[in-house]
Structure formats: structure tokens, C-alpha cells
């Protein structure tokens, strides 16, 4: 017997196949007279982010998202046109997005932060996992049923996304011309932006991705003003931290199954700690990620370190020694200098450090300076970090 669900799915996939056959009709204005090529007017002033660019033309915006390894063949291109506007010639491989975006599905808490920063939280209609969100407004929309859970990227509910048909889906990942995980969606006229902000090596570089969201929702002036204020405050704090006479040594994270992942010299965390006036071992390495090292290699540094930060999913020193009793021998453990970034975890387990903290690096930096050099910021109260007891 043919069920109603089977009929629905058959109809849905038939529609998708039909749309795929009529690909030129999917994008707004595609059948209208195409606009002749224009000369660029200006480029967005991106001082810190390396993973994308925005070029402004008279009637549209061109966004490029780059492969972090620098392979230009992997560049993803998007045309942001005014709703109902004509599509310019000369961009055969570009995905087209109508602006201002009125509906978006985000796949990570960072995407919630970008939307919130642009003060456009009402456009969020879907999340990969509803537990990701810390924003008070977004949690309210979730309770009201205005934001749907669409599944993780590895198990994305394509049927639901197709039915919702957002103006854009923001995914997580490095751009690659060889892999198109979202072909079904793009063939159905749903643009997918690969957001790789997590690959930026500096706190301000990661935060500057707010300008991509600004371009999508036509709020560049607002976002630029807010971001400029963050840059000013962040750089003031860096100069303040330079006044410290001593740079305390810092170890981070905990070993996982015998491997201790420590930040490389050009990584996001390494820049944060050095900007806060701390010193870390392996700061002279060139990578932007982590070094997988053995417990035996890291433990001599941990035995003599001044501070231990960014422990992971633990809330107390007892939890730490419950995982490995040897932690009790480390100097920062003995001296009470163990701090974790889990002060702002809500009732569903979302950690706001990864959300609002990502677009407010000046506050994270204030926390780190307060921990490492409390005399420099005597009035500051920790926002994202807490001392583990």
C-alpha cells in the first residue's frame, strides 16, 4: 500500500528533478534581460579576515569565499543582488542571493552570533542543532517554534530544508571545488555559503566575518561601526597587556586518549594568549591549528606552568583528577590557577564563549588579561571564564 508519506516524498523528488531540469529559472531575474557587466566601485575594508572578500558594484555585491590553503580554483563566488534585480553577466559559476536576506538556516553557534551582531535575529529560521544557541532572543524564537532543527551537516534533513526554502543556508567547512555536499540544495535554488571563519588565525580575523553577514542583510554601516569599536578596544587592551613586566607561562586543554593537543604558534588561541601577555610553549611553530603531542612531552611544561586554561568540558578540579590523577602534580593545579571558558553555559548546554565570545574578542581578551595580570584590570569581572575549584 502506498502511504501518504511515500506519495509526498515522490512528489518532492519529482519537483526537485523538474527544477533541476529548469535550472535557469531558479534564480531571480535569470530569465529577464541580463544586466551588462559593471566596473567595481570599491572593496570592503577587511583588515584581519583572510577567508573572504566583498566587492561592491553599483547594483550588486560580489562575495568570494576562499580555500584556506590558497587554492583559487576552490574559490566559491556569490552575487548579492537587490530583490527582484537583474543578474549581471560575467559570473557563470556564481550562486545568486537576493538581499536583504529574509530567511537563513545556520549550522553553528557562530552563525547565530553573526546574525545577532547584525541585529537581524528575526531572519533565522533553522539551526543544525537547537541546543547550539545561547542568544536570549533566539532561544525565545525556538520556544515559540519559529526556528526548526534541520540536523547536522553529516545528517542534514534535506526534505525539511527544501520545504523551508531559505534565502540562504550557511554551512561550516573549507571551500573545495572537488566536493559539493550541498548539490541537491543548490540545484533546487537554495544558495549555500561555506563559512570557514574557524580557520582564521587571529581573534579579530574570526570576528570580522560579521561583515559577510552585514552584506547579506544590507547592514554594513551598522556592523562596520560596531566592529570598529571592537578593534579599537581590543588594540587598547593589547597595549595594556604589554605593560606587564612578567609574562606568565600557560598550558591549555587536556590530553585526549593519550594525545595532548596544544595550540600552534599562529593559531587563534595562541594569538589570544600572547595578546593577553602570556607565554606558551611551541609559540614558534607556524601552524594555525594544534600540535598532537604525547602526555610525556607536555607534562614537564605543565609541572612548572603558571596557569592552566581552556580545559574543556569539566567544571571542577575533582573532575580533572577523576580523569587523570597526575594532574594534581601540576603547578597551576596546586596553586589554584586553573580557569575554564564555561562560565556562560545555559540550561540546554550551549556555551556562549563559542557564540557571542567569537564576535566579542575584546571581552575574551579582557578576561584573559584579568586572569594573567589582574593588577592591569582591577575592575573587570570575568564574563566567559571561571576559576575551577
Predicted regions and their residues:
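Bacterial Sec-dependent N-terminal signal peptides
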Residues: 1-29, 368
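Soluble non-cytosolic domains of exported or imported proteins
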Residues: 151-156, 172-179, 200-207, 221-228, ...
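Extracytoplasmic ligand-binding site segments that recognize negatively charged/polar headgroups
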Residues: 111-112, 127-137, 177-180, 196-211, ...
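Structured C-terminal subdomain patch of bacterial secreted/periplasmic proteins
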Residues: 27, 108, 200-228, 310-389
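Second-shell loop/turn segments in exported
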Residues: 94, 99-103, 113-114, 146-152, ...
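Bacterial Sec-exported substrate-binding components of ABC uptake systems
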Residues: 22-112, 222-251, 371, 375-389
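A short, structured surface patch at a secondary-structure boundary
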Residues: 64, 69-162, 168-174
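Flexible, glycine-rich surface segments
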Residues: 236-324
Amino acid at each position: 500500500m502506498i502511504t501518504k508519506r511515500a506519495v509526498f516524498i515522490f512528489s518532492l523528488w519529482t519537483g526537485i528533478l523538474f527544477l533541476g531540469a529548469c535550472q535557469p529559472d531558479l534564480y531571480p531575474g535569470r530569465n529577464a534581460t541580463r544586466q551588462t557587466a559593471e566596473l567595481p566601485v570599491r572593496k570592503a575594508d577587511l583588515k584581519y579576515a583572510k577567508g573572504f572578500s566583498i566587492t561592491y558594484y553599483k547594483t550588486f555585491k560580489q562575495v568570494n569565499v576562499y580555500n584556506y590553503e590558497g587554492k583559487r580554483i576552490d574559490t566559491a563566488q556569490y552575487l548579492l543582488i537587490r530583490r527582484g534585480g537583474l543578474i549581471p553577466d560575467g559570473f557563470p559559476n556564481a550562486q545568486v542571493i537576493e538581499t536583504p536576506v529574509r530567511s537563513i538556516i545556520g549550522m553553528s553557534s557562530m552563525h547565530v552570533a553573526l546574525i545577532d551582531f547584525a541585529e537581524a535575529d528575526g531572519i533565522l529560521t533553522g539551526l543544525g542543532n537547537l541546543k547550539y544557541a545561547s542568544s536570549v532572543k533566539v532561544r525565545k524564537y525556538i520556544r515559540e517554534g519559529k526556528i526548526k532543527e534541520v540536523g547536522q551537516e553529516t545528517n542534514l534533513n534535506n526534505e525539511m530544508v527544501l520545504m523551508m526554502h531559505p534565502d540562504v543556508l550557511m554551512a561550516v567547512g573549507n571551500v573545495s571545488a572537488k566536493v559539493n555536499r550541498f548539490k541537491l540544495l543548490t540545484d533546487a535554488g537554495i544558495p549555500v555559503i561555506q563559512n570557514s571563519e574557524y580557520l582564521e588565525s587571529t581573534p579579530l580575523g574570526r570576528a570580522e566575518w560579521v561583515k559577510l553577514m552585514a552584506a547579506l542583510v544590507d547592514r554594513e554601516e551598522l556592523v562596520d561601526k560596531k566592529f570598529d569599536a571592537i578593534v579599537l578596544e581590543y588594540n587598547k587592551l593589547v597595549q595594556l597587556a604589554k605593560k606587564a613586566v612578567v609574562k606568565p607561562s600557560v598550558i591549555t586543554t587536556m590530553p585526549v586518549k593519550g594525545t595532548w593537543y596544544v595550540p600552534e604558534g599562529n593559531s587563534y588561541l595562541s594569538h589570544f594568549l600572547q595578546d593577553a601577555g602570556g607565554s606558551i610553549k611551541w609559540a614558534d611553530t607556524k601552524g594555525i591549528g594544534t600540535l598532537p603531542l604525547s602526555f610525556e612531552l607536555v607534562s614537564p611544561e605543565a609541572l612548572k606552568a603558571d596557569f592552566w586554561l581552556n580545559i574543556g568540558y569539566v567544571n571542577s578540579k575533582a573532575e580533572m583528577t577523576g580523569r587523570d590523577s597526575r594532574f594534581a602534580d601540576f603547578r597551576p593545579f596546586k596553586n589554584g590557577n586553573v580557569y575554564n571558558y564555561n562560565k556562560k553555559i545555559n540550561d540546554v548546554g550551549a556555551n556562549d564563549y563559542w557564540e557571542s565570545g567569537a564576535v566579542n574578542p575584546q571581552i575574551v581578551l579582557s578576561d584573559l588579561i584579568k586572569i594573567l595580570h589582574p593588577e592591569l584590570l582591577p575592575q573587570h569581572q570575568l564574563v566567559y571564564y571561571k576559576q575551577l575549584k
